[in-house]
Swiss-Prot record:
GO BP term, example: viral budding via host ESCRT complex
Organism: Rabies virus (strain China/MRV) (RABV)
Phosphoprotein in keyword set: yes
Major localisation: virion
Lineage of the species this protein comes from: Viruses, Riboviria, Orthornavirae, Negarnaviricota, Haploviricotina
Protein name according to UniProt: Matrix protein
Length: 202
């Protein structure tokens, strides 16, 4: 048991560095490659409460014995209760976490690291969402620990408003990202102006 505790401690404390400040990625940056079911859209016509954000997102899944997405989804179902960041940006964080986890992970010791660095376009309904010019630095660890296994999620999201053109994606409703957003109870409604885009309600 002591050995397991040491492993878990090492796993949690392996990387204590703060994420680097958000900077705009080059246009050809492919740190995150979307799965095949993501289809690029030409443009977003609506200008209603629309903002571009330069985003750095990282989700580090840590487990000495491996993990399954069933457990990750179970952990994320309690996201609203445990989220400790700026609540005006909780919708943005959910989108970034879902996109990051739907990409390809990179092994790092006992961890699997999912990273996302994009310029993303977000639309909020009415007066919801972050204030003009508001920035986010969010970091949190969520753990699942029972008699049989330990899984830790280290989530980091940095976001600041920017004026660089973002990439727009239409996502298949059966994609992994949509499953994760459903688990996290992401609140959206279809945009009246753009049939392929949604407005965030949080």
């Amino acid at each position: 048991m002591n050995v397991l505790r040491k492993i878990v401690k090492k796993c949690r404390d392996e990387d204590t560095q703060k994420p680097s400040p958000v900077s705009a990625p080059p246009y050809d940056d492919d740190l995150w490659l979307p799965p095949p079911e993501y289809v690029p859209l030409k443009e977003l016509t609506s200008k209603k409460n629309m903002r571009n954000f330069c985003v750095n997102g990282e989700v580090k899944a840590c487990s000495p014995n491996g993990y399954s997405f069933r457990i990750l989804r179970h952990i994320l179902r309690s996201f609203n209760e445990i989220y400790s960041g700026n609540h005006r940006m909780v919708g943005l964080v959910k989108v970034v976490v879902g996109l990051a986890l739907s990409g390809a992970p990179v092994p790092e010791g006992m961890n699997w690291v999912y990273k996302l660095r994009r310029t993303l376009i977000f639309q909020w309904a009415d007066s919801r969402g972050p204030l003009e010019g508001e920035e986010l630095e969010y970091s949190q660890e969520i753990t699942w620990d029972d008699d049989t296994e330990f899984v830790g999620l280290q989530i980091r999201v940095s976001a600041r408003q920017c004026h660089i053109q973002g990439r727009i994606w239409c996502i298949n409703t059966n994609s992994r990202a949509c499953q994760l957003w459903s688990d996290m109870s992401l609140q959206t409604q279809r945009s009246e102006e753009d049939k392929d885009s949604s407005l965030l309600l949080e």
